[in-house]
Amino acid sequence: MRLLFKQRFFSWFDSYDVYNEAGETVYTVKGQLSWGHCLKIFDKNDNEIGTVEERIFTWLPKFEMYLGNEYIGCISKEFSLFKPSFDIDCNGWHIEGDFFEWDYSIVNTFGQNVATISKELFKFTDTYVIDVYNPEDALCALMLVLAIDAEKCSRD
């Protein structure tokens, strides 16, 4: 399953549309005013289905993930010198990025790819392509991309 994650050009807060391969909107992400990033994910019927919320006052960035109101885990940036690395405590996944922070791989505990993330270059807004190998993992993979993008925006 392929998703295209596109930040809206004119928006006061973080706001994204997520499209499937047919160009249909499958998710909408709306940022809220808060300390740190707080991103709410809505399905195509405008039902809130998930949240990514930044923990504040941590040494390295951490984001909590919720499905509905249920806490499912945390994504934490790990200290690394040359390429970004993130740990996910909910399902044993791990994220490795390249030096330029354009491409990422999400792998499970067995070293198998769960999803790949690629940033499209030469776009006015942040645009990512997410290739998810199991469609059931699409929402969780989207949450991880949101956390990575929010962490990058905080540094820039």
Could you say what each language-model-derived stretch is?
Residues 1-156:
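Intrinsically disordered, low-complexity proline/glycine-rich segments
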